[in-house]
Amino acid sequence: MPGKLIWLVGPSGSGKDSLLAALRQREHPQLLVAHRYITRPFNAGSENHIALSEHEFFTRAEQHLFALSWHANNTYYGIGVEIDLWLHAGFDVVANGSRAHLALARERYGEVLVPICLAVSPPVLRQRLEQRGRENALEIAQRLDRAARYKPDNCLTLNNDGSLRQSVDEFFRLLRSHAAREADQLV
């Protein structure tokens, strides 16, 4: 049976990178975290990603080495086609996805896709954006506005206002609940 592709999305500052790093440390033999291939330096930001030049990115895209790819914020992002092998082998795969490209992921993966949307209250999101120090006050206001306006449909919601441990536990609880609902539908 194929695994599930967990498409983790949320506004900038919602804690996706921290959650993914914590999931990598958690003992769970059937869960793999996909790296993103990104056209930005390896040491830019906190995401554990594979840095590519635009030339490298386009070469890989032409060779169909990305299962999914998109362009946002003057940067190219890709999820390697290796996730298809992992899913076929029965592993669940978590990918740092894009809210704006959720429809693309749904189109390609259908019922295998399990979107999880990180939800963070505006005060917590503001605090996180200010603490990381990458954006000025205007950019933070724009990010907060965008976060309030864009809420994907048909997404499991994970509140990420609390501790990282709470979020990891809630992540696995959501997956178990989703699996139980799917099993009930088969009966």
Curated annotation (Swiss-Prot):
It is an enzyme of class 2 (transferase). It catalyses: alpha-D-ribose 1,5-bisphosphate + ATP = 5-phospho-alpha-D-ribose 1-diphosphate + ADP. The keyword DNA repair does not apply. SMART domains: GuKc. The keyword ATP-binding applies. Its EC number is 2.7.4.23. SUPFAM superfamilies: P-loop containing nucleoside triphosphate hydrolases. GO terms for biological process: 5-phosphoribose 1-diphosphate biosynthetic process; organic phosphonate metabolic process. Keywords: ATP-binding, Nucleotide-binding, Transferase. Pathway: Metabolic intermediate biosynthesis; 5-phospho-alpha-D-ribose 1-diphosphate biosynthesis; 5-phospho-alpha-D-ribose 1-diphosphate from D-ribose 5-phosphate (route II): step 3/3. ATP binds at G10, P11, S12, G13, S14, G15, K16, D17. One of its GO terms (molecular function) is ATP binding. Catalyzes the phosphorylation of ribose 1,5-bisphosphate to 5-phospho-D-ribosyl alpha-1-diphosphate (PRPP). Belongs to the ribose 1,5-bisphosphokinase family. This is Ribose 1,5-bisphosphate phosphokinase PhnN. The lineage of its organism: Bacteria, Pseudomonadati, Pseudomonadota, Gammaproteobacteria, Enterobacterales.
